[in-house]
Amino acid sequence: MLVLDFINVGNGDSMLIREMEGGEQRFAMLVDCGHDKLERDDHPPLNDARSCRIFAGDFLRQQGVSRLDLLVLTHFHRDHIGGLGRVLEAVTVDELACTYLPPAHSGPLDPDGDNGLPKAARNLLRCVDIYAEALRSHPGRIARGTALSGAVTEFRQPTPALSFEIQCNDPALYPRQKAVYDAMFRGERNRYDLMHWGKCMNVSSLHLRLHYHG
């Protein structure tokens, strides 16, 4: 049986995909991790009885999920990667698949420091910093990382009944994304590059197509 949970993370996205058999988990994949905050100005406060919001990591615990076969990050907006740290507190991950992996031993990006950058550029630094910090502060929780080049569609068949494709949107942008992000971690702060990429960073995203024959 294929089970899809669209997790109510508030202003963000996170989806849990599981194949279950006899109450046992045969395969589990999380697509995105939601925001790092549930409290938003345009939503009811958390003490409101109508609120059913939950962090993705807390939802995984609630469902008894302690291991993910695959974690897919479609892009690096805060409402998609902000909850990564909480997810890694809750589960171990066999594979992380995304469009960019930070350099080994990368340090903080300090988005709120005295860098003279405009808001859009700082926002890009902040999003990537949250992502990299979550990986850095949870060593050993992810067995391996796969940076998808965008050159080909990834086909996976984790079980006989379940297969899926990870499709890359506008793969020509992936090398540029890597160049801009790598420069960040080298301490370079190109105002134009950061502003430009901050406005189009969701263009180089991933799309998932599921096939189930259970």
What are the language-model segments listed below?
Residues 5, 72, 97:
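Conserved Rossmann-like nucleotide-binding pocket used by diverse enzymes
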Residues 13, 38, 80, 105-106:
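Flexible loop/turn segments at secondary-structure boundaries
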Residues 1-66, 199-214:
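Conserved beta-strand hairpin/beta-sheet module of binuclear metal-dependent hydrolase folds
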Residues 27-29, 67-70, 95, 166:
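Structural motif
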Residues 20, 32-34, 74-76, 147, ...:
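Active-site-proximal beta-strand/loop segments in catalytic clefts of secreted hydrolases
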Residues 1-2, 81-214:
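Flexible, acidic/histidine-containing loops and adjacent segments that form or flank the divalent-metal
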Residues 45, 72-73, 196:
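A generic structural signal for short
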Residues 68-79:
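Metallo-beta-lactamase
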